[in-house]
Swiss-Prot record:
PANTHER family: 39S RIBOSOMAL PROTEIN L28, MITOCHONDRIAL (PTHR13528), LARGE RIBOSOMAL SUBUNIT PROTEIN BL28M (PTHR13528:SF2). It comes from Ruthia magnifica subsp. Calyptogena magnifica. Keywords: Ribonucleoprotein, Ribosomal protein. Gene3D superfamilies: Ribosomal protein L28/L24 (2.30.170.40). Belongs to the bacterial ribosomal protein bL28 family. GO terms for biological process: translation. This is Large ribosomal subunit protein bL28.
Length: 78
């Protein structure tokens, strides 16, 4: 699976490593992703999601049911 958060849509961005001599080489900045398992009460099963730290905070705030509904509206399979 891609390095993308399913809740926030955060994905890698590109930038530069900059040395002391100000030489620049290309690199990628990756989001802080974690695979996390959530118990969904109304479906009576676990759901495994790849989330950024911000995505985890959103689920803590809004609840897993609300977030899963928004993911499914976008057409993603969960």
């Amino acid at each position: 699976m891609a390095k993308v958060c399913v809740v926030t849509g955060k994905r890698p961005i590109s930038g530069n490593n900059v040395s002391h001599a100000n030489n620049r080489t290309r690199r990628r900045f990756y989001p802080n992703l974690h695979t996390h398992r959530f118990w969904v009460e109304n479906e009576n099963r676990f759901v495994k999601l790849k989330l950024s730290a911000k995505g985890l905070r959103i689920i803590d705030k809004k609840g897993i049911d609300t977030v899963l509904a928004k993911i499914r509206i976008r057409g993603e399979k969960v």
